[in-house]
């Protein structure tokens, strides 16, 4: 278990100590575990113990004092030998209106506890819960409820004791934890008029417990995902998105990142902190929200690296630059942890902004504020940080009606003897949410910020969002990808470009115009997330005629190979179904973070700005494959290979009769080639963690799936093949008039 690193700043607090300085003894091994040192054996070095999963170290850490002796934080007795002890989960103290089995004093990792209700009561929550290796129970609190109260029975979490048994409007319940367990969440909750309990469900946890990234990421990601979906200014109809850090379209988000730079962090961890923070900033700025970011590092004193009052706080490049310039030694002369001063810096920033905008103005009152505090929760100077939080709540006028305007997240990283009580005291308390967490190490922190944006929570039609987490399915990575088929035989692919329109290739429909039997499969066809849609209308480009140049000896010609399908129903947005961004639209402009007034030409210059542009298409088996789109002089050399194809074009004298400027070209030796059946699928790029369709698969000189019925089997062309593989894709920048004609009421197009 790594040192409890809770901030984005690692400071070497004792550089250049004299050779005469004492060093601490080296007989500090732990039975069954290992240890790390932040600064060797010198005074100021933090020793952190680690144990295998399912065990925890006792003590968790020791600090080398200036006297040359080790001290265990919080210990009153002399040093004892460090050992690894088994992790245990707390037992129920009581269970109302039911029984639980087995009845133990505490439960080992892997142990289960089961719940049953008495007659007349209905079980809500998890009937069986298992003790996890982090000392936390899986599942949800089991409650036996008869529905008689104005609010539902709030239950009693494992290890907790509750006083208060009335659940009417205005009634209160109070919680405390048994033995040495620590309470996180709300110690008191009130039944509100809307039938919901105030605050956050209390949890009693072992002092050594921590949270898994897969638990923290959804909790943070739900808040930010709702916020991102709620701030899409291009949505034409309002949808109810629920609470979370929700911002009205006329509003703005101030995001404050507070990074603790104390002696318990190392330089390597500091680099991971900065990388994680930069990743989070990059992800948030990749969505079309109005956001300003403040960055504050602190030890004994705070250092404001970026203020929300600075215009650059709205510029992702400037914000990330400020993070990158955060110096490991910025706080080397400060040995304390002054969380109060860091939060007070936020308060002063808010106060200055309120004076600038005017306390009574909508411009001030509609700003939402989110504070992410990365710390060990061990403030040891400057006063109580809760006082600063109270000042912040007061200046923002946070009450029941304005509770959504402030969220404070307190996140600890590592496993020192964390002051859970202080972390819990600082974090916001809101129904159904958690705002205080402890992560095991900096790697876990990086995972959280990388995967915190759960796109399944975006009910808006925000475009170009793929789930890139490690456990995401192929369909979740490319949720715009659809399959088009007549009855049962798959023929083509396509891409969702809105909640009701699919873009595909015209040649998929050249055998007839009756589409009543055709289906479009949206989502993962191999799971419950797949759904078939009827086609309400097919719009085929009138310029497409595969035999248009047959009398010139060109047996097949694929100019204007583009079509639109309007689905009979709108697609419900989810992690498995979401439109891709089309260039030259306001939706794509926001995703690219381009300024207002940008044009279609600006998008082309940004997306297709190199001689060889890395791009992707989706294979028959759903995987994402790589190609390189050739531009400029490389486009010419790529296309000229067609002259070697004597079967389709026996008398070709001018390559441009076949490969017009409507086509993008790929297929060099390192590229994958599309198979028959992959036509119509999107050719797309990634920019700023968003995906943009620049073309669609049309035709090629080589079929890597020929002769194989296995969707996972692709055969590369031999190097000696004549002609070598080449693939051609309709260039959407060259089809703008047609797209605007048919999608003008669906998408918001930019000037050409």
Curated annotation (Swiss-Prot):
GO cellular component: extracellular exosome; extracellular region; extracellular space
GO molecular function, a single term: serine-type endopeptidase activity
Result for mutant: residue 348 to A: Promotes partial resistance to degradation, slightly increasing half-life of the protein
Record-listed Mg(2+) binding positions: 262, 264, 337
Domain of life: Eukaryota
Motif MIDAS-like motif: positions: 260-264
Keywords: Age-related macular degeneration, Complement pathway, Disease variant, Disulfide bond, Glycoprotein, Hydrolase, Immunity, Innate immunity, Metal-binding, Protease, Repeat, Secreted, Serine protease, Signal, Sushi
InterPro entries named in the record: Compl_C2_B (IPR011360), Peptidase_S1_PA (IPR009003), Peptidase_S1_PA_chymotrypsin (IPR043504), Peptidase_S1A (IPR001314), Sushi/SCR/CCP_sf (IPR035976), Sushi_SCR_CCP_dom (IPR000436), Trypsin_dom (IPR001254), TRYPSIN_HIS (IPR018114)
Disulphide-bridged cysteine pairs: 24-64, 51-84, 89-131, 117-144, 151-191, 177-204, 463-581, 492-508, 584-600, 638-665, 675-705
Residues annotated as domain VWFA: 254-452
Main EC class the enzyme belongs to: hydrolase
Record-annotated Sushi domain positions: 22-86, 87-146, 149-206
Binding site for Mn(2+): 262, 264, 337
SUPFAM superfamilies, alphabetized: Complement control module/SCR domain, Trypsin-like serine proteases, vWA-like
Marked site positions, Cleavage: 243-244
UniProt EC number: 3.4.21.43
Location (main, coarse): secreted
Stretches assigned to the Peptidase S1 domain: 464-744
Disease cited in the entry: Macular degeneration, age-related, 14: A form of age-related macular degeneration, a multifactorial eye disease and the most common cause of irreversible vision loss in the developed world. In most patients, the disease is manifest as ophthalmoscopically visible yellowish accumulations of protein and lipid that lie beneath the retinal pigment epithelium and within an elastin-containing structure known as Bruch membrane.
Free-text function comment from the UniProt entry: Precursor of the catalytic component of the C3 and C5 convertase complexes, which are part of the complement pathway, a cascade of proteins that leads to phagocytosis and breakdown of pathogens and signaling that strengthens the adaptive immune system. Component C2 is part of the classical, lectin and GZMK complement systems.
Domain writeup: The MIDAS-like motif in the VWFA domain binds divalent metal cations.
Protein name per its UniProtKB record: Complement C2
Native species: Homo sapiens (Human)
The encoding gene: C2
